[in-house]
């Protein structure tokens, strides 16, 4: 067993060895290294063919047409292109956008930028289980609403939104629906023929593909128009200029094909490990799961250990690679904005740890994790005066702390 044990699959996944092996064939002089846009010789044609195959593999993952897939540098760029692209193209129709308070920063900060440009954004509050109620979404819709951007799966707590219902509602009102699927593509079935979603952001490195590559699904029927954010040679049907990185695209394609083939078996195994982990630690006093327990992805478990500081717990869990909050905001000392939006107080939000399990997690690793977590919590609580006061029956919310 390799230490530390990697339990941070929601931050990134290792590249599947089968994907890495395939990528190696598209980089060196011995391989297919040409520019896919070079139309005058075999090096370019072979690269273009490899890109076409990968485009089909990504499209197959979500049951789309290959012409609806635009390659980007990742989900952050896809979110930017989708949200800014729609806002700028349809601004004469309206300037109102709806999103939620628990979105990834790549969506929230893009919306903030649009606010600076004169757009109006409504940030919906979730229920305490992390899910946005449909009635709240419908109530926020106006005649000038042009876009709804709601994530499929939350990156911190793993809850799943009902995208079919959101899609139906948006389509009935003539509003474009964008979905950030960084955490769900390759892990949950997505079918764009059945779900009325217009734009989907996909990330390679969240599904055992390489970092630095992603895709944006752009619906053709009804046709969604975007204003390009990256200008140049007019690649990707004018939506995203820049030489296509063949080896990364091949990696994303291969990762998509593997995910499609193995999703069902992967999910059963991962859910078993997740339940094993929770069953192994839920007996610890004052331990709570954040987010809906049923409507969540198989690999995700966000737990608050009351009266334990999240940062000190992470230090104590040095054998486990876990995070408090998302990797993108883990450098800040602020409590998770996602958990605060669920109604958790600062203390509970600060004492949360995100465990995310994936394709290469083993049972032995989970057993070790349970042991380490149990010991660490005991040790930290032994040192905590707050825990002692709580055990003595003192209501800490009523305590008047002296200010020095």
Curated annotation (Swiss-Prot):
Is the keyword Calcium assigned to this protein? no
Modified positions (N6-(pyridoxal phosphate)lysine) in chain numbering: 206
Entry's EC annotation? 2.8.1.7
Write down the chemical reaction(s) this protein catalyses: (sulfur carrier)-H + L-cysteine = (sulfur carrier)-SH + L-alanine
| A Gene Ontology term for the protein's cellular component | L-cysteine desulfurase complex
Matches recorded under Gene3D superfamilies:
Aspartate Aminotransferase, domain 1, Type I PLP-dependent aspartate aminotransferase-like (Major domain)
Instruction: Name one molecular function that GO assigns to this entry.
Output: cysteine desulfurase activity
This protein's major location comes to cytoplasm
Q: Which residues form the active site?
A: 328
Q: Where in the cell is it found?
A: Cytoplasm
User: The organism sits in which domain of life?
Assistant: Bacteria
List residues binding [2Fe-2S] cluster.
328
- HAMAP family documented for this protein: Cys_desulf_IscS
Q: How does it assemble?
A: Homodimer. Forms a heterotetramer with IscU, interacts with other sulfur acceptors.
| Protein's recorded name | Cysteine desulfurase IscS
Provide the species name.
Shewanella oneidensis (strain ATCC 700550 / JCM 31522 / CIP 106686 / LMG 19005 / NCIMB 14063 / MR-1)
Underlying gene: iscS
């Amino acid at each position: 067993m390799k230490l530390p044990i990697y339990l941070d699959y929601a931050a990134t996944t290792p590249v599947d060895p089968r994907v890495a092996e395939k990528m190696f064939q598209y980089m060196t002089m011995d391989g297919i290294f040409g520019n896919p846009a070079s139309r005058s010789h075999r090096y370019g044609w072979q690269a273009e063919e490899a890109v076409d195959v990968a485009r089909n593999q990504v499209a197959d993952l979500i049951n789309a047409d290959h012409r609806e897939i635009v390659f980007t540098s990742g989900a952050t760029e896809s979110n930017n292109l989708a949200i800014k692209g729609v806002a700028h193209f349809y601004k004469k129709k309206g300037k109102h956008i709806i999103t939620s308070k628990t979105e990834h920063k790549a969506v929230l900060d893009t919306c903030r930028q649009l606010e600076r440009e004169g757009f109006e954004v409504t940030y919906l509050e979730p229920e305490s289980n992390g899910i946005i109620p449909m009635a709240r979404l419908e109530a926020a819709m106006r005649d000038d609403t042009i876009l709804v951007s709601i994530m499929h799966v939350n990156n911190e707590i793993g809850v799943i939104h009902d995208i079919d219902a959101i899609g139906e509602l948006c389509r009935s009102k003539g509003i474009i629906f964008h979905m950030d699927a960084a955490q769900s593509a390759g892990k949950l079935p997505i079918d764009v023929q059945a779900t009325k979603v217009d734009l989907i952001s996909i990330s390679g490195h969240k599904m055992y593909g390489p970092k630095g590559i992603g895709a944006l699904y752009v619906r053709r029927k009804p046709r969604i128009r975007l204003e390009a954010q990256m200008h140049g040679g007019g690649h990707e049907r004018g939506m995203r200029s820049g030489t296509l990185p063949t080896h990364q695209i091949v990696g994303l394609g291969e990762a998509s094909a593997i995910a499609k083939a193995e999703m069902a078996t992967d999910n059963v195994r991962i859910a078993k490990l997740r339940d094993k982990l929770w069953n192994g630690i839920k007996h610890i006093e004052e331990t709570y799961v954040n987010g809906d327990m049923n409507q969540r992805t198989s690999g995700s478990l966000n737990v608050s250990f009351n009266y334990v500081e999240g940062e000190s717990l992470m230090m104590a869990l040095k054998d486990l690679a876990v995070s408090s909050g998302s990797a993108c905001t883990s450098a800040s000392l602020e409590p998770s904005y996602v958990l605060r939006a669920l109604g958790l107080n600062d203390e509970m939000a600060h004492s949360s740890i995100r465990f995310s399990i994936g394709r290469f997690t083993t049972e032995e690793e989970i057993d070790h994790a349970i042991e380490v977590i149990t010991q660490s919590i005991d040790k930290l609580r032994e040192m905590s005066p707050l825990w002692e006061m709580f055990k003595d029956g003192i209501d800490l919310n009523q305590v008047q702390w002296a200010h020095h």
